[in-house]
Amino acid sequence: MQPQLSRPQTATNQVRNSVSGPWSGNAAHKAEKYFITSAKRDRNDKLQIEIMPSSGRRKLSPTPEMIPKLIDGEIEIYVLTTQPDIAIDLGKQVIDMENRYVIDFDKRGVKWTMRDIPVFYREGKGLCVELDNRIYTLNEFFK
């Protein structure tokens, strides 16, 4: 039995082979999504990162094999702005960069939502994030 696509006119090259589900427009079907859950320094002041998939099933440490997958778009890595290990004061930067508000329709007011900052690979620098048109390596970004 052939897998059924949710959109019949979708070309075969628009569905990733590495993902089990059909393409549905949901980001979870396009790439594996990971979040940095912890970024601590060891005794030698080297950054130790712990990531977790969006499914929340297991904690991982980034491996060199993940870099090509990140570059090819097979996986996506994000840092939540609520992460306590961030060294940069994100308060004003995140609000200025993108006013992310959710209107609370049950008359309790406007609430600020957390934002996810994408992590990307830059040649010569390694894993990086960008805020206010400035690129930070993860080593600079975390305490």
Swiss-Prot record:
Keywords: Electron transport, Photosynthesis, Reaction center, Transport. One of its GO terms (biological process) is photosynthesis. It comes from the Bacteria. InterPro entries: PSI_P840_PscD (IPR019608). It holds the Pfam family RC-P840_PscD. Residues 1-23 have a biased composition (Polar residues). Residues 1-25 are annotated as: Disordered. Disulfide bonds: none annotated. Component of the P840 reaction center. This is P840 reaction center 17 kDa protein. The gene is pscD.
